């Protein structure tokens, strides 16, 4: 069957659902996927630096964060993107909580974060977040156990960063700072295809050596980490509101 034949073929998905299933299983993600329903388009002000690819790599941090800063934190069993634990440093109410800012009756956008008791144990991380100068929401350290490429791909997702974010306020994006040194591990990024799933033709990798910094629009890009090391990988993930302050920080941190 040629591509022209496919274009003109009748829609038999309702009469023969097993044919639709055969098409779906050709993608490595199960469908329907919750990420596919997260909005891509909105009127929120966004960063020019992310317009083209949805991410920007920044220069490496000159003075890496000491391991005593992140090993002493209180971690919670919370799964996202693999076998993970998270240490909340800033949350909606300052409590140790890995959930979003959407508690029933107290829904709010992922901004105006309040530091938790973990922040007292990592003063350099706290200073780093504050030095960006932009409004931050969730701030946390992720601990990720090793996972190979195929395992990682099955955990790809997009983030619902802008739920409850007023459309006239800055689009929320996320920054990464690698705390451990795993240069053979990488962040895997893909754009969404017309079927609402990650498009392998757009796959990009960002290496995860110690001190690596980058900013991602994780509501736009499907993402996950392939961690090939033999020890846990730690990284700082921070939500920031797009706007002049974040733009100035990006300009300062470009290579």
Predicted feature locations:
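Catalytic core of Fe(II)/2-oxoglutarate
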Residues: 188-255
């Amino acid at each position: 069957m040629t591509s022209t034949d496919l274009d003109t073929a009748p829609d038999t998905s309702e009469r023969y659902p097993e044919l639709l299933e055969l098409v779906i299983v050709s993608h490595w993600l199960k469908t329907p996927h919750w990420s596919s329903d997260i909005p891509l388009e909105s009127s929120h002000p966004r960063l020019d630096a992310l317009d083209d690819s949805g991410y920007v790599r920044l220069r490496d941090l000159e003075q890496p964060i000491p391991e005593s800063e992140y090993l002493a934190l209180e971690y919670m069993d919370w799964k996202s993107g693999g076998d993970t634990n998270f240490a909340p440093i800033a949350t909606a109410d300052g409590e140790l909580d890995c959930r979003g800012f959407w508690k029933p009756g107290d829904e709010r956008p992922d901004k105006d974060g309040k530091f938790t008791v973990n922040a007292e144990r990592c003063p350099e991380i706290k200073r780093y977040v504050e030095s960006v100068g932009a409004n931050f929401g969730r701030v946390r350290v992720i601990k990720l156990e090793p996972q190979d490429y195929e395992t990682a791909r099955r955990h790809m997702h997009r983030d619902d960063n802008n739920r409850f974010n007023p459309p006239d306020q800055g689009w929320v994006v996320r920054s990464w700072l690698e705390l451990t040194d795993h240069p053979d591990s990488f962040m895997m990024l893909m754009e969404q295809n017309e079927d609402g799933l990650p498009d392998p033709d757009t796959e990009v990798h960002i290496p995860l050596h110690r001190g690596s910094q980058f900013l991602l629009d994780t509501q736009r890009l499907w993402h996950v980490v392939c961690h090939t090391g033999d020890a846990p990988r730690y990284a700082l993930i921070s939500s920031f509101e797009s706007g002049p302050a974040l733009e100035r920080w990006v300009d300062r941190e470009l290579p």
